[in-house]
């Protein structure tokens, strides 16, 4: 299998970390949807990161579906078994994904010429990001987000979203405002599986 996309994408990185934790072997190729469009188009004409090329050449787009395929292949999931814990994990995973989505949206807005930026929209996505980070920080403070020993999807999503915020949009994510989330994410980043997939790998 081949996972395609840059690790500074929270979606690519979450898929890579999850696949590794599930014990799967796959190749990774750092191809940018911005700097290497022609190369990416040759792999997936949708130019969507991450993309997974399966062993039979099928291309799967969208990180959630790639993770679902990883679970199918491994015959297991990182999600908890107990119903109430599983539901909480789903909720927190969604919040982590929203945090990543809004941080990505902020970065995309900054790529626009200043005259084409819409201040009310920028304010909205920043507010959404901060709400998501507030919720994740509170969950980390309650011990609902951890760094293992058994990582859940919500732990991974939260840590990777925070890492992306600090790497790409640090001015919108000061550590002192969300210290519990920062501590949880820092503990995750110290794990071998996170070190295997560093956000700054070219």
Predicted regions and their residues:
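GST-like fold's C-terminal all-alpha helical module
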Residues: 96-184
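GST-like domain detector, emphasizing the conserved glutathione-binding G-site
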Residues: 1-119
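Long hydrophobic alpha-helical segments typical of transmembrane helices together
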Residues: 175-202
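Non-transmembrane alpha-helical segments in soluble domains
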Residues: 67, 71, 90-93, 133, ...
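Class I S-adenosyl-L-methionine
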Residues: 16, 20, 137, 166, ...
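Short, contiguous strand/loop micro-motifs
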Residues: 2-3, 171-172, 196
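Aromatic-glycine hotspot motif
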Residues: 52, 64, 129-137, 193
